[in-house]
Design a protein with these regions (language model features):
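Cyclophilin-like peptidyl-prolyl cis-trans isomerases
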Residues: 1-149
Length: 149
């Protein structure tokens, strides 16, 4: 079976992410469900920190929201948080990931084994690099459409 991909169509172009169910099957299933339901369509990157990461997936754009689905059990794994890695955001409680995720701009080893890695950018990282910066950005970049193939 071919690797499944998540495509985030941004205003500037497509970001193609290789999904990693071998690392985090529950998290990958959630991402696929939400993308299939159109949950991510129109959602912004509400927290974009240069040299660190771009975070999105909050339906209200504040960083405080999530889907109506139950929070996920942590699936911390050995994959390192390096440039292009996609990982799930959460509160200080390990089992609180829901819909928000982040994409690393740079290596962030202090996150390793504390956040669930579920994918890696295969192409289009330049579009993540170009997202407006800020917490939140004055004019945040957004996901036009998220699709799984």
């Amino acid at each position: 079976m071919a690797d499944e991909k998540l495509t985030l169509s941004l205003e500037s172009g497509d970001v193609v992410i290789k999904l990693r169910p071998d690392l985090a099957p529950g998290h990958v299933e959630r991402i696929k469900e939400l993308a299939g339901e159109g949950f991510y369509d129109g959602v912004t990157f509400h927290r974009v920190i240069p040299g660190f990461m771009a975070q999105g997936g909050c339906p209200d754009g504040t960083g405080m929201g999530g889907s109506k689905k139950p929070d996920l059990q942590a699936e911390f794994n050995d994959a390192p948080h390096v440039r292009g890695v996609c990982s799930m955001a959460r509160t200080s409680y390990p089992h609180s990931a829901n819909s928000q995720f982040f994409i690393c701009f740079d290596d962030a080893p202090f996150l390793d084994k504390q956040y669930t890695v579920w994918g890696e950018v295969e192409s289009g990282m330049e579009h993540i690099d170009a997202l407006p910066k800020g917490e939140p950005p004055a004019s945040p970049g957004k996901i036009v459409k998220a699709t799984v193939s």
